[in-house]
Amino acid sequence: ITACLVLIGTVCAKEGYLVNKSTGCKYNCLILGENKNCDMECKAKNQGGSYGYCYKLACWCEGLPESTPTYPIPGKTCRTK
């Protein structure tokens, strides 16, 4: 049973670019690959991810719950001030 739960958790985990819900923009990063800031942001309590790194100058997260939005947010374009 435990193995099945682990497998289901892995299959159902979401991944994608972390997005700022207010602006609709990706979280930017400069240090590609392993990135402490991206990892910290992805693992934050309000995000719920298991791992994060910098990919194509934006934070990519793995192991996100389905409830965490990823870029792009449908119907919302990236707007900065």
Swiss-Prot record:
This is Insect-toxin Cn10. The keyword Disulfide bond applies. It is found in: Secreted. CDD domains: neurotoxins_LC_scorpion. Has the structural arrangement of an alpha-helix connected to antiparallel beta-sheets by disulfide bonds (CS-alpha/beta). It comes from the Eukaryota. Residues 14-79 form the LCN-type CS-alpha/beta domain. Belongs to the long (4 C-C) scorpion toxin superfamily. Sodium channel inhibitor family. Beta subfamily. The lineage of its organism: Eukaryota, Metazoa, Ecdysozoa, Arthropoda, Chelicerata.
